[in-house]
Amino acid sequence: MISKTKAIVISSVKYGDSDLIVKCFTPNGLRSYLLRRIYSSKNKQISIAYFQALNLLEISGSDKKNGQLNTIKEVNIDVVYHSIHGNIYKQSTAIFMAEVLSSVIWEESDSQSLFDFLHTAFQWFDEHQNTANFHLVFLLKLTQYLGFYPEVKNSDLKYFNLQDGIFTNVYEKESCIEGNILNVFKALIGINFDSLEELKLSSGSRQIILEVLMKYFQIHLTGFRKPKSLEIFKELFH
């Protein structure tokens, strides 16, 4: 049965000599697609360019769940990006965010609200210029949909415990952040993408808070892996 769905490209991997396996997040959860002979010189139908990281697509194809490979009959760009794939900083950010999503979105994920958040966030990212801190706000907002957004009450307390997700006056060396990094963490909580220009961070603070957020994800998500692109990404924003 052929169905039509909106989709966000999460990953694409070459399979064999000429095939491609693409993983996409849809309003009905994660879907995997096998595109046969897409690398073949005889392929005249579907371009590999459709399947760049975080592209927003509209796909007509089969709709099998549980990790089974689907086929694509037709694919179109749902929203055209104007800057993400032509700007090395944005492109690197997109690859990094796609790697994060690949680790946190499971086969059984079925969330229209998460899909809507991602769809809107990536359009905003494409349309705006001052996006050096976008990935930080994105990661923290993403925790709302993954079930471990920080408890915001008592934010006047001296520490934030990453393990418990709360502000506290009880210091635990392995779990707590404090001082300037705590202030940056507080600034990220509740901020809108439209207010990003007000967030002024040094490259050093940006890298430290990114490591804090990666640790926060590792604590709360079993099997979460730091993206392979993280070190290259950090170098670009040094």
Segments and roles (model prediction):
Residues 1-238:
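Non-catalytic alpha-helical scaffolds and adjoining flexible linkers that form interface surfaces
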